[in-house]
């Protein structure tokens, strides 16, 4: 099967997807409530979409095509409110976070969907272990070569995005020592990691044709890359973030990505090279493990700094672009969080204590999400 044609979209338009946890309100473990949630949301007039995910204790919400941060936040909050109303009728809790803190993956059930059953048959237990929760952001691109430039340009900011969004310190009842343990589950898949180096759609199509000829892939859905082009939407999809604990933080992260994309597309400040990826996996690990305190190696000059310092430099770089997009306040809140060392992983660890159990932490996560609390 050949790669489909790239459908151009409005430059810098934005869309957001969030994978959410469904938990029982008696024990705050994951609960198989996706079917009931989808049944009760069917036919509602929503500002976006609600879909199933790999297992039946997950659900995905997605905005429509948005212009800016304010539009993203309005749509996400509308979806949140609709879901919360139905969840309360079902005695179900909804929360963000990249992992559930104490669920047993062996108890998960694959959602009844042909593709999910196929993936379970192909990947075995990895499919159930993939009960992790991420935020995906789509950025509109005017053409395929612009999309590939953006894929490689944004790859330099993967550590920044991991540290900002990290919300998965707990797994299987343990503190993992990671800021984002979710990405370790993603990295287990054979077609994960980073996209191949190609700067023209013809070169990218040649790569896809070779992979298709091996029988390994049949569509772009088969690639679990951190950033990938989505030709059917005319977008670049950034897939590396943990799901935040609030829609406000999710919208702010989307605004940061949009401002980075505008900076890259307007100023064209870099000429991507294959060698940029020499430090990609190192930087990715540092962000997952240590968050803001991790080491960032500049792909171009190989200088070292903390990820917090790299983030601060990026905020300065995109300042005018954030203003043009009307996102300076939202990005300013992220900037303040970096300066004070705060992210959702920090908040989650702060909830746990000698008198506070992991189920109580999940209950607090649900309170934040369902009550519409701020960043």
Swiss-Prot record:
Keyword match Nucleotide-binding: yes
Function: ATP-dependent carboxylate-amine ligase which exhibits weak glutamate--cysteine ligase activity.
GO molecular function, a single term: ATP binding
Keyword annotations from UniProtKB, A to Z: ATP-binding, Ligase, Nucleotide-binding
Superkingdom of origin organism: Bacteria
SUPFAM superfamilies: Glutamine synthetase/guanido kinase
Name of this protein: Putative glutamate--cysteine ligase 2
């Amino acid at each position: 099967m050949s790669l489909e044609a790239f459908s151009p979209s409005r430059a810098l338009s934005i869309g957001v997807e969030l994978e959410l946890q469904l938990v029982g309100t008696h024990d705050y473990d994951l609960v198989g409530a996706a079917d009931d949630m989808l049944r009760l949301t069917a036919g509602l007039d929503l500002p976006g979409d609600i879909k199933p995910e790999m297992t039946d204790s997950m659900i995905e919400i997605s905005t429509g095509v948005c212009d800016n941060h304010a539009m993203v936040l309005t749509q996400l909050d509308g979806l949140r409110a609709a879901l919360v109303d139905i969840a309360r009728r079902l005695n179900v809790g909804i929360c963000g976070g990249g992992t559930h803190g104490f669920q047993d993956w062996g108890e998960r059930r694959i959602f009844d969907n042909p593709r999910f059953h196929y993936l379970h048959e192909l990947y075995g237990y990895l499919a159930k272990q993939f009960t992790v929760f991420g935020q995906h952001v789509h950025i509109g691109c005017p053409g395929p070569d612009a999309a590939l430039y953006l894929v490689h340009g944004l790859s330099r900011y993967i550590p920044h995005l991991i540290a900002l969004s990290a919300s998965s310190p707990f797994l299987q009842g343990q503190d993992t020592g990671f800021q984002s343990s979710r990405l370790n589950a993603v990295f287990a898949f054979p077609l994960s990691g980073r996209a191949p180096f190609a700067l023209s759609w013809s070169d990218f199509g040649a790569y896809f044709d070779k992979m298709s000829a091996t029988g390994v892939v049949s569509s772009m859905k088969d690639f679990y890359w951190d950033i990938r082009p989505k030709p059917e939407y005319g977008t670049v999809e950034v897939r590396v973030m943990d799901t935040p604990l609030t829609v406000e933080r999710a919208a702010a992260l989307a605004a940061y990505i949009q401002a980075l994309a505008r900076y890259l597309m307007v100023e064209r400040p870099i000429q991507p090279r294959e060698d940029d990826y020499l430090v990609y996996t190192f930087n990715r690990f540092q962000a997952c493990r240590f968050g803001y305190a991790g080491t960032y190696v500049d792909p171009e000059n190989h200088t070292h700094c903390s990820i917090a310092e790299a983030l601060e430099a990026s905020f300065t770089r995109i300042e005018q672009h954030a203003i043009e997009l009307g996102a300076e306040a939202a990005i300013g809140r992220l900037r303040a969080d970096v300066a004070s060392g705060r992210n959702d992983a920090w908040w989650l660890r702060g909830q746990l204590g000698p008198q506070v159990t992991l189920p109580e932490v999940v209950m607090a996560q649900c309170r934040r999400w369902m009550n519409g609390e701020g960043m």
